[in-house]
Amino acid sequence: DRALGRRGVLVAELTYREAVSRAIAQEMERDPSVYFIGEDVAAAGGVFKTTEGLLERFGPSRVRDTPISEQAIIGAVMGAAMNGLRPVAELMFSDFFAGCWDLIANQIAKTRYMTNGQVSCPLVIKSGNGGSVRFGAQHSQSVENWAMSVPGIKVVSPATIDDARGMLQHALADPDPVLMFEHALLYNVE
């Protein structure tokens, strides 16, 4: 179960899903201010299983299930980020950004500018993105273009396993908000 990586070094074969999961766990291990919230991310391990095992490893204070309210999830991580934590929020599907877009585009993205750099929102919002996974019309869009023109937001959409791990780690180190769109058809790719 090992193969040569791009740099000729033996590496464990991972799926895209496992790379995302490991990156989250590594950053939570490295930085105690990183925590994870979203619908079904704790006990169920997330709709795409990218948070499987995190609850057992880090406990309920750092891996939390939320009600089905994207506005509540995003409002909570905004407040936490403004107060020194490094939250990661998962919105199950990127279509659901519509329900909390005001908070993302008009509040989170502009906090650094509205406070003259005194306050920032260092957070990550990650989401399954794209169609063809048979979850229905309201679970199939690719909405990263919504965020591309919003000043103050960084947008990443990892295409490879290395991208998924590296971009998530860099996003968690970034002083500004990062939206991470993970194409749903990539989760099982090795």
Model-predicted segments: where are they?
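Thiamine diphosphate
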Residues: 5-181
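Aromatic-enriched
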Residues: 183-190
